[in-house]
UniProtKB/Swiss-Prot annotation:
Signal peptide (from-to): 1-20
Record organism: Arabidopsis thaliana (Mouse-ear cress)
Protein name in the entry: Alpha-dioxygenase 2
Lineage, uppermost ranks: Eukaryota, Viridiplantae, Streptophyta, Embryophyta, Tracheophyta
A single GO BP: fatty acid biosynthetic process
Domain of life: Eukaryota
Amino acid sequence: MGFSPSSSWFLHPQLHHVVSKMSYFDAFLFYIVHLVDKLGLWHRFPVLLGVAYLGLRRHLHQRYNLVHVGPINGQGYDTDEFCYRTADGKCNHPSDNTIGSQGSFIGRNMPPSTSQYGILDPHPSVVATKLLARKRFIDNGDQFNVIACSWIQFMIHDWVDHLEDTHQIELEAPEEVASGCPLKSFKFLRTKKVPTDDHHKSGAVNTRTPWWDGSVIYGNDETGMRRVRVFKDGKLKISGDGLLERDERGVPISGDIRNSWSGFSLLQALFVKEHNSVCDMLKERYPDFDDEKLYRTARLVTAAVIAKVHTIDWTIELLKTDTLTAGMRINWYGFFGKKVKDMVGARFGPLFSGLVGLKKPNDHGVPYSLTEEFVSVYRMHCLLPETLILRDMNSENVDKENPAIEREIPMTELIGKKAGEKASKLGFEQLLVSMGHQSCGALTLWNYPNWMRNLVAQDIDGEDRPHLIDMAALEIYRDRERGVPRYNEFRKNLLMSPISKWEELTDDEEAIKVLREVYEDDIEKLDLNVGLHAEKKIKGFAISETAFFIFLLVASRRLEADRFFTTNFNEKTYTKEGLEWVNTTETLKDVIDRHFPRLTDQWMRCSSAFSVWGSDPNPKNWVPLYLRSAP
């Protein structure tokens, strides 16, 4: 029983029903969070207060924004027999062997939408053409480069994809926008609705493993795993030029190959090299390890390196503030920091020692999965450019800040099967340096890549599908099809105040004019994806605050619910040397330096490999991180 509405005069009227479901303690915490939100203060707080606010908000989301979908019908098993990551994600949860496996249900962070609006209201092609389609390329400045853009595809292909039905749908652009649509109509497969055994309800199934298990390079099942392995010394297949091998069809050989492009494949190849290097190290230290033991241990180590790079490197660049730098490092190392954790281990619980290395996983009473809402806020195709700017690495005048431009390659030449051949001609180093020196797109209105509105999509086996698709329109359709709430309903479910006028969303007068036109001045009709791209951003954030609060919940959950980042994150499972490999790797730059020792010295000035390489490094700040004042 929560506080009565009369005790909360400052509470937004549309949030009373949310508070009424809370315990007294949680309602009290919510009032604190809500007051801070109304004043717009949390990101202006000194670091410690900002981190405290995020801790309170995360607690509330863990209590009220985790919704399980589907039956729980797994079996118990002996965790000592499965001290490795299985091919299909089974046997991770300590008491249920199917939680988090391939083919499990995609969960939710809130109930499905109760919206009265139809799936074509307004038409997705109208939304895509009038509000999303790129008019001119808007970049992200020096904060995020094309490597960072590729990284998030690398992660999504590790985590989640929806099972599709065999039933085909056709979207035909209305006459008012047809002339501006690259495709006047397009066909696609709808998301398959699978019965959940819960009062005739249905849900969607994940064809990938939702654990942070590196399945993007290892595969999501036994067949995929066998395809990528050499079956000698634990290693994975890689070509002599350091890029992915390709089969007789020209399809890359890697864990997940659907809808790939050269930048994505480059990261797959880099971490195949990382895996194989771990195998070499382990074989030298443990000559009695057979192929299977080497493979399993190297996979654990490599997956942990990927998770760590994402947590304390990529995310920190995405949310470039002192508060989020502190928060993400606390997630991994705890409040006491790396030095203390390295000396004494994870002895002091999640707050002081971090989520990694906990005695047992914590799913907060809701079986682990990734969620529909998580998928929606990770729709970041605006990060992709129209062309890749190729840098000349053989020029006599080597300029680390701004290497000479050799030429621009249209992105359409870097996708699908032809991407592998193009990458081989260019070489790993030229591709990586070029991506590092190019700013990616900004997540804003009118910045959706035009080439993705006339796209050849691929099947799970990497083969091209017969029908071109308009991804901008399709993404609007997908959120509605899957019951993801629209923008205002989404915010209310996330314990945020809804907007009551367009000016609260954006200061852009042109955007307000078009939003009113497209949504018939009905603010409740606003699509989530459009709202996230239109929303005013916190200084330093590449994403919206609304999207960030889903990140806040799920980023922690991916670590704390996983047995191999908690109970089994130890020397017995990883080996002493394997654990040291993870503990001494802090950034993507560390991984690059391991395999290309002189590359970053010659071509990179900045502090993170995810920032534009020619930009200035982070300035030295002598004030301890936790004691820094408001920005």
